[in-house]
A protein has these predicted regions:
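DNA-dependent DNA polymerase catalytic subunits
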Residues: 53, 58-327
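Autoprocessing domains of the Hint superfamily
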Residues: 1-52
Length: 327
């Protein structure tokens, strides 16, 4: 399951261990090491390499040989008749250098019409083909996201829907993408955002350590140093409920429960700016008003700006005005 000589005593360095599939009675995991120098290590389970993928752009290769036919057929044949055997030989040479057998294999898993990469394990792809399928998926029919808001269970329903729509728009336009047109679409989405119910635009999460960070939620609202935002949101709910007439109808939020939370309007920077509530139990009688501008910035504008910047554009401002570069 791991290379014992290199990693003995290093288990405390493991950042995450994620099950990525089940194979009959066996399991395969993806391990991530949070330590400089161990980022490129490989892990094996049942002789299957489960750590790291490599994405390659074959556009320059195709242009260099003036290939005018199906690009996906080109890549498949290039892999089958040239790359597959070449990579195997390279692994064999590397293994021989270290006097060991080669157990690594590099397989073609998927082809994409396009992709945007934000960083390691943070990307979105417009999948065209995926092993073991024989046929291509229609363009924009299979969007794969990893490490971004679309892949996170706590993303607000409205945000998930609109981020998917915006990313599809980017892929559809391709080289014809127009940032001005994109801003107009965002403005329309923001107008629609402002009439949504809180449940549709709130962030979902589990909450713990309420007792640790919430110092006082009865006579006044006090939080401890380093209190996470979602814990503060839960504590603020309890404070308002404790000082209301609805303690029979609604329950206090306890550690290990699932909540949703959103940003609220405040009169000063010193006031608490987040409010949470139990999943499926929005307390409309005492819930403070949503700060729609801040909530929009956090769950839609900030995530989409990361893609805008990755495409080479300046990030869009909260007022959704284009800022021209001076130089």
């Amino acid at each position: 399951m791991y290379r014992e000589i290199e990693f003995q005593g290093k288990f405390e360095k493991i950042k995450s261990c994620e099950c990525i599939g089940e194979f009959e009675d066996e399991y395969v995991y993806d391990l991530e090491i949070d330590e400089e120098g161990y980022d490129n290590q490989t892990f094996f389970a049942n002789d299957i390499l489960v750590h790291n993928s490599n994405y390659i752009n074959f556009g320059a290769v195709m242009n260099s040989c003036e290939f005018d036919y199906d690009p996906f057929e080109f890549v498949k044949r290039l892999n089958e008749y040239r790359l597959k055997e070449y990579i195997k030989k390279c692994y064999d040479i590397y293994a021989k250098k270290w006097n060991t057998d080669n157990y690594q294999d590099f397989e073609l898993e998927s082809l994409s019409y396009g992709g945007i990469f934000l960083g390691k394990k943070k990307y979105v792809l417009d999948i065209a083909w995926q092993d073991p399928n024989k046929d291509l998926f229609p363009k924009l029919s299979k969007i794969k996201s990893t490490g971004i808001e679309l892949a996170q269970s706590g993303t607000a329903p409205f945000a998930r829907e609109k981020l998917t729509f915006l990313l599809r728009h980017i892929f559809e336009k391709g080289k014809n993408f127009d940032i001005r047109e994109f801003v107009k679409i965002l403005k329309e989405i923001k107008n629609e955002f402002k009439v949504q119910k809180a449940d549709q635009i709130s962030i979902g999460t589990s909450v713990n350590n309420i007792e640790k960070f919430i110092i006082n939620d009865t006579t006044k609202f006090e939080v401890g140093k380093g209190c996470p935002m979602h814990v503060r949101a839960a504590g603020y709910h309890n404070y308002i409920l404790n000082n209301s007439k609805y303690k029979v109808k609604y329950s206090l939020i306890r550690s290990s429960e699932k909540i949703k939370y959103y940003f609220v309007k405040t009169k000063s920077e010193n006031e608490n700016n987040v409010f949470g509530y139990l999943n499926g139990s929005y307390p409309y009688e005492y819930a403070p008003p949503v700060d729609f501008d801040e909530q929009f910035n956090r769950i839609i504008l900030d995530p989409i700006n990361r893609f805008v910047e990755a495409m080479g554009y300046a990030p869009l401002s909260p007022n959704l005005l284009l800022v021209r570069a001076l130089f």
